[in-house]
Curated annotation (Swiss-Prot):
The keyword Signal applies. A lipid is attached at G42 (GPI-anchor amidated glycine). Glycans are attached at N20, N24, N27, N30, N33. The keyword Cell membrane applies. Residues 1-18 form the signal peptide. It is a lipid-anchor; GPI-anchor. It comes from the Eukaryota. Keywords: Cell membrane, Glycoprotein, GPI-anchor, Lipoprotein, Membrane, Signal. This is Uncharacterized protein YDR524C-B. It is found in: Cell membrane. Residues 43-66 form a propeptide. One of its GO terms (cellular component) is plasma membrane.
Length: 66
């Protein structure tokens, strides 16, 4: 049981870090773009974060199957 918890926690951390990297990349481009691009890029960053959370949930579910 402890091994499953460790695997699930590691998968969650990895997914969150991946989401943070994609969000940070979008924020870096926001500094030099126009306001209209910031809005669309913000939506893309929000979608990336949502995908990261969903990926973490899937990874945790798969880890508990084993």
């Amino acid at each position: 049981m402890q091994f499953k918890t460790i695997v699930a926690a590691f998968a969650t951390v990895a997914a969150v870090q991946a989401a943070n990297v994609s969000t940070n990349g979008s924020n870096r481009t926001n500094g030099s773009n126009t306001t209209s691009t910031k809005i669309s890029t913000g939506a893309a960053a929000s979608n990336a974060l949502g995908a990261g959370v969903f990926g973490a949930a899937v990874a945790a579910g798969v880890a508990f199957l084993f």
